[in-house]
Amino acid sequence: QFIKPYQEAMDFLMVQINILNDDYREKYKDYPIHNIQTRIKTKESILGKLEKKELKKDFETAKNHLTDIAGIRIICYFESDVYHVAEQLKKYTDLICMRESDYIAKPKPNGYKSYHIILGVPVYHTDSKEYYPVEVQIRTLTMDLWASMEHRIIYKSSNVNMEKSRQVFLEFAEELRDCEKQLFELKEENNKKEG
């Protein structure tokens, strides 16, 4: 029962995201989104997070303090697509932008890049509506590759040489950024030839 409104909020937001992608495809004969992943935290994960934050373990506390119970990850092709999708989502009048963090413009010290937005999404009841937060992470394919590898090699491991890992992942982030830049330039060049 606790998860139900978060699922409804995520479903509502997924409709908006799919409309955005379809409209973009129709208007520009292109589409910014490669794929979309969704997840809802398990009860155990929610309770663990409340415990870690030393908060009371109940529905009301979780609702008031956790903004990542429902999450959507949007994987785009290029950085410009990430910003386009983020701007479009912020324009929807039925959504509330609660918080945003641009880790593309200002990557985390370890090299992590992504655009995070916490959106308040309306959930309608018979005689009222209530907003539930959905964490939206928007990143490119190369940013997602970096994050997936970092999660697999460092985050999930207990025996890590942090200094070496940090250096390798910073270099990896730079190489991926260069690859993405070259591919974007190639795409733009090809679009000019077609146009």
Roles of regions detected by a PLM:
Residues 63, 76-183:
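Long beta-strand-rich cores associated with HINT superfamily self-processing modules
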Residues 1-67, 177-180, 187-195:
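Charge-rich, low-complexity segments
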Residues 69-75:
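Terminal, regulation- and interaction-focused segments at domain boundaries
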